[in-house]
Amino acid sequence: MSESRAADAHILSVSIVAGPSAGAWLQQIGLSRKQRRLILPRGALSADANHALEQISAIADQGKVDHLVVECDSATPAMAYASLFLSPPLTDIARLATTVLAIRASDLLNLLVRRVASPELGSPCFIAEQLELVDHVVLGGAKDDPDLKLARNISIALNPRAQVSDLSSETAGRLLDNTESMSFDFGAALDGSGWRQLIDGEKRPHNGGNAIASFAYRARRPFHPQRFWTLLQGGLPSVFRAKGFFWLATRMELVGGLNLAGSELHCAAAGQWWAARDDHARQHEMPERTRKEWHEPFGDRRQAIAFMGLDFDADAFKEQLDDCLLTDSEMSAGPGSWATLSDPFPSWTAHSHTHECDHDHEAGDHECCHH
């Protein structure tokens, strides 16, 4: 046992590897000269916190492993496993070092850009959300594969904080041999996705790099439900990722959450606007970031959606979104009149919140959109 291992009192370092190519990448890993490594193949580690604790405790107690590599099953996101390491008792015996998503460049483009469905790859939103939260993205493909450059640029747009590399035995060995100096940062993962940075104003709108364009759409008046619905039903063919929240004129109480990746689009309730809550809740529970966004007479109600697209005219698309907003005459009619507007969106309830947006709708540090 190494001195550093003894100093850590048998704290086990753990890496989580997810994605359609996770198994292929892990097969390339050879023996490590730096540490004793154990790979748990897909489905071997339970996503149930209590069962996972028992499994990892048994491995740690044996004292024969320095580094545990967990391959996610196709139905469980990497963050579901990562969240197990947020608090004791698991943090007393194991430390999450890093998270990895492995996928072929062509598969990523098929899901997000070419919109080619594949049951083996999973849903576009599932893959996009995993990519946005990991530390490392590993792309498969030949070195002369034209898909590699575009897939790399899309990965960086989705997750600016991630290290993007090729799927090779050298990459695997180099990454997993240095876990002693790594520590997965949950806060950075939640705040570091490209869409989140765009909405928060921490990432500048981007144009270039294989014709990728990104921007955050913001407005302080509601969408006409029928016009916005019609725009969305067009499929937004040039957009490969969109996420954020929106305000429908007919729904003054509830936040609309939008989540698009490739051809997959979800719109659902994402909590309640703070402006629709009572004075006591706003005074004592409303987050500071929401207070900074507050504007009378409608409070925190607004549009804030990040869009990323390929070969599309961002300015023209912004005009399309502007056309979905209420006109001056519609605005002057007031909320009573807005309630009678045609609204083809499915009905929402406050309890149908599915974490589709980044809206501070509860007290504390709960964050939407981070599964």
Question: Locations of the language-model features?
Answer:
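Short amphipathic alpha-helices in soluble, non-transmembrane regions
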Residues: 231-234, 317-325
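Short, conserved charged micro-motifs
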Residues: 23-26, 145-149, 223-227, 312-319
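Short glycine-/polar-rich loops that comprise or flank the Walker A/P-loop
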Residues: 35, 65, 94-98, 133-135, ...
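Conserved beta-strand segments of the P-loop GTPase G domain that flank and frequently precede/overlap
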Residues: 15-19, 40-41, 69-73, 100-104, ...
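C-terminal accessory "lid"/substrate-recognition subdomains
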Residues: 45, 108, 116-297, 331-371
